[in-house]
Structures are given as C-alpha cells and as structure tokens.
Amino acid sequence: NLANLYEIGVDGESNFAKAVELYEEAAAMNYTRALCNLGLYYEEGTGVEQNDKKAVEYYYKAAELGDEVAQCNLGYCYEMGIGLEVNMQKAFEYYQISSQSHYPRAVSNLGLFYELGKAGPIDEQKAFECYQIAADSQYPPAQCNLACCYEDGIGTDIDLQKAFELYKAAAQRNSTRG
C-alpha cells in the first residue's frame, strides 16, 4: 500500500524509485500484487529501465501464485509477443485461467479469441457469453464488444437498442469506442 502511495504521488509528486524499492521488498515475500506491479513497471519502463523479459518473469511468478491480473498480463504477453514468442494457444490458456477468477479484462479477451478464432474454431455464442460476463462488471471494452454483438448479430439476435445502451454505458466510462 505504501508503494502505491509513492506511485500515485501522495505528496503531490510520484516517486517511482521508492515505489519500486518497496514493491521489490514485498515481491521478495511473494506478495502477488507487488510482483504484478513490478512486471507492469518493467513492461512499460516506469521507474525502471524497460525490460520485457524481466516483466514476464514477474508476471510468471505472480501467475503461479494465483494472481488473476498477472495471469491475464501473461496471456497478453503471449498474444502480442512481449518478452515471449507469440503463442496464441498459451495466451488462450492464460486468459482461461484468469477468467476463472472472473477478471473482466481476461474474460473479454477470451471472448475475442472465441469471436475471431485466434486459438481454435470460431464460437460466436461463447464470445457473446464472455462479453456479457465482462460487461456485467462494467468493463468498457467488453461493453463495446457486447454492443457489437447486438449490433451485428454475433452470437445473439440483432438488438440495436441494447447495442446503443451498451455503447452509451461505455462512453460514460470514457471509452473512446463507446
């Protein structure tokens, strides 16, 4: 928690070096949120030199300890080739694991895999179901994806009123797609 306060700048200015130091202390005790945050720092180069390989190491450790955000981030790394070779099947597996905790981003990404057939056959019904679950958590990208389903009849009947409502809800949460 203290590391997070340094990160957001409790005294008015962020101190990423101090945040990294505190996250590293917590990570040494297998605190998964610290491991995941360090992974993100290394992926983005926030307060540290950007290093995709090191980011993946932190994500792996947190994912092995059950952190759903790290599991999703690891799926994204496999999907996009961040610090790893692109492997859509591994990405799909990590999104599935993270989705078991109902992490909205992972569930929405899983929906995209079903909709587009990124790691297997296209399954529009499963895509729709994933988007619905993630949208129920007020996750704007999933709300937009679900709106597209209603707009285009993907996994469901066309319902332009529902599509409009979902786009509007996403826009109210500052989604550029809403």
Which residues does each predicted region cover?
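Hydrophobic face of amphipathic alpha-helices that form TPR/SEL1-like repeat modules
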Residues: 1-8, 12, 22, 35-44, ...
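Intrinsically disordered, low-complexity linker/propeptide segments enriched in Ser/Thr/Gly/Pro
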Residues: 1-5, 111-113, 128, 167, ...
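Short helix-capping/linker turns of helical repeat alpha-solenoids
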Residues: 8-10, 15, 23, 28-32, ...
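Intrinsically disordered, low-complexity tandem-repeat regions
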Residues: 11, 28, 35, 84, ...
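Intrinsically disordered, low-complexity repeat tracts enriched in Gly/Pro/Ser/Thr and acidic residues
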Residues: 54, 59-61, 95
